[in-house]
Amino acid sequence: MERNSSLWKNLIDEHPVCTTWKQEAEGAIYHLASILFVVGFMGGSGFFGLLYVFSLLGLGFLCSAVWAWVDVCAADIFSWNFVLFVICFMQFVHIAYQVRSITFAREFQVLYSSLFQPLGISLPVFRTIALSSEVVTLEKEHCYAMQGKTSIDKLSLLVSGRIRVTVDGEFLHYIFPLQFLDSPEWDSLRPTEEGIFQVTLTAETDCRYVSWRRKKLYLLFAQHRYISRLFSVLIGSDIADKLYALNDRVYIGKRYHYDIRLPNFYQMSTPEIRRSPLTQHFQNSRRYCDK
């Protein structure tokens, strides 16, 4: 205790007070280093934010080392700043290698830049998602799924082309790029349940889509809860878009247009009108989403 008090006394009480200050300013290298430190500490998070921070801090420490060697002639100041410069340089190279090593096929690049990057998904997280999937080509007029025959065993996201959805030969709606092919079917089943498609999905043009196997995707969800919540939001939004697309085509009479926001009103006000297969399928789709 006495030793600490004596140290504090030597540093504060008995330390000589600066009576004369240097009149001339330090060299330009010193001020450049200070500016680089200020700007460097304004960097953000993520890979590119770290690259920004370590690059500017490294340059700042390098300028400080040069200033200590040329102007101050202090070996200890030079040594510390040079060591810190080397550490920042090594961190920069390590992070740059990580970013450079994350490369994707063209379909995944489109998917990331158009859908996942605007949501703030980092490249490492997207890489985890992409490694669990595969890119599949579907030729024109070939079927992705057939009504009453194809089992629901995967989840797919269209990257290019256009898919036509029909039920009993009657057109329902189109599926465009960056939309899921089978989000209602996926959402209608629990992880332990099995099911088959109630619609037919046919490629109107040559299509490319990214597909995740059902069991593999559920395993990914169990390992990464963040990815599970992300897909839950994406699938829910996709189902809502499909329901509103159906709403534009469903009529329950010559003068009545079925609105998904007022289903009970139409059931009470027009009970005598016979529903078409399209209307019935629309209501079944709503039941899937209500589960």
Swiss-Prot record:
Sorted UniProt keywords: cAMP, cAMP-binding, Glycoprotein, Limb-girdle muscular dystrophy, Membrane, Nucleotide-binding, Transmembrane, Transmembrane helix
Distribution of this protein across tissues and organs: Expressed predominantly in skeletal muscle (at protein level). Also detected in heart.
Residue ranges crossing the lipid bilayer per the database entry: 27-44, 48-70, 77-99
Domain of life: Eukaryota
Known outcome of mutating residue 155 to H: In LGMDR26; causes aberrant modulation of the mechano-gated potassium channel KCNK2, when tested in a heterologous system
Pfam families (UniProt xref): POPDC1-3
InterPro entries: cNMP-bd_dom_sf (IPR018490), POPDC1-3 (IPR006916), POPDC1-3_dom (IPR055272)
Glycan attachment sites: 4
Biological processes per GO annotation: heart development; regulation of membrane potential; skeletal muscle tissue development; striated muscle cell differentiation
Cellular compartments annotated: Membrane
GO cellular component terms, A-Z: membrane; sarcolemma
Effect of residue 217 to F: In LGMDR26; causes aberrant modulation of the mechano-gated potassium channel KCNK2, when tested in a heterologous system
GO molecular function, one term: cAMP binding
Associated clinical condition: Muscular dystrophy, limb-girdle, autosomal recessive 26: An autosomal recessive muscular disorder characterized by adult onset of weakness and atrophy of proximal limb muscles, elevated serum creatine kinase levels, and dystrophic findings on muscle biopsy. There is no cardiac or respiratory involvement.
PANTHER family noted in UniProt: POPEYE DOMAIN CONTAINING PROTEIN, POPEYE DOMAIN-CONTAINING PROTEIN 3
Family: Belongs to the popeye family.
Function: May play a role in the maintenance of heart function mediated, at least in part, through cAMP-binding. May play a role in the regulation of KCNK2/TREK-1-mediated current amplitude.
UniProt protein name: Popeye domain-containing protein 3
Protein source organism: Homo sapiens
